[in-house]
Amino acid sequence: MRRIFAMGIAALLAACACAAQETPTEREAAKDVLRQIGELEETLNVAAMTAKLTAADKGRDEVTARVKELMDKELLPMSDWITLHPEIGFTEHEAVAKLTAYLQAHDFDVTAGVAGLDTAFVAKYRKGTPGPNLGVIVEYDALRGTKGAFHGDQHSAQGPVGLAAAIAVAEFLTRTHTPGTVTVYGTPGEEMMPPEAKTVMWNAGVFKGADIIVRSHSTSATSRPAPGFGTCCMNIDGVKYTFYGAPAHELTAWNGRNALEAVIKLFNNIDSVRSNMRPETRIQGVITEGGAAPNVV
């Protein structure tokens, strides 16, 4: 299991650099998570594991070389293609078609539409043998912009990177007769909720059978000061507020209650406290419904 885990991590790192966001705000929001991570670090002895993973290893070098070959020859062009053909969450049919066709061509059996999600899929290595199962998560949805969908969060690269890692590790297992297998999980709509796709897939039992699941995400940083888990993301909370009013014609507005005015005050009040927030804090919002006619409150 450790060997397959090491190969999986090495393959992902060969295709992209990973870094952690570490700020006082994140640490305060994730105290309990950090405590658990600290206990896990002590159990695993991350420094020793890092030294082992970065030591000379012929098998790992073969895997990383294969990752580079796949990326340079085939998967970077796929990433560029997905970038130029963005699809928002739960409509990523073209991206999924590209990713799954490539997996099928490299000895993976694909099941599409898992957990009732049209653009979710599971791809299992058909040459795998009983043993540890390395899971690789890929995402491929685009952001929603005022001028249409666009890729601004590296999801166009994440799929190809994950495929390179999964295929390189799978080929290594077969070539060296190492027990184990690889499963790729295609998870849609990461930028668009609800539904929370990974939660839906988890509740449906899609991830059962995986011994460990890894995922990569592109970043501009190429190194960290020390080995360790760190905190990987800001604490994210999604909140939906609904304001209720009473309709009235604008000429007799005093007979109604203008819910839209309350919504605008909410946004203004949030803006008024931004100057006191730490620079890494982000609060964003959108008005999904603000009335049907301008002459009705």
Features from the language model and the residues they span:
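Positively charged n-region of N-terminal signal peptides that target proteins for export
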Residues: 1-4
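A short, glycine/Asx- and small/polar-enriched loop/turn
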Residues: 127-132, 235, 296-297
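Acidic/His- and Gly-rich active-site-bordering loop/insert found
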Residues: 24-152, 156-183
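Alpha-helical transmembrane segments and their juxtamembrane interfaces
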Residues: 12-13, 165, 193
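Bacterial N-terminal signal peptides
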Residues: 7-15
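A short, polar/charged loop/turn motif at coil->beta-strand junctions and beta-hairpin connectors
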Residues: 7, 76, 117, 130, ...
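Histidine/acidic-residue-rich, glycine-tolerant segments that coordinate divalent metal ions
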Residues: 144-152, 156-157, 176-296
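Boundary at the C-terminal end of the N-terminal hydrophobic targeting segment
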Residues: 17-22
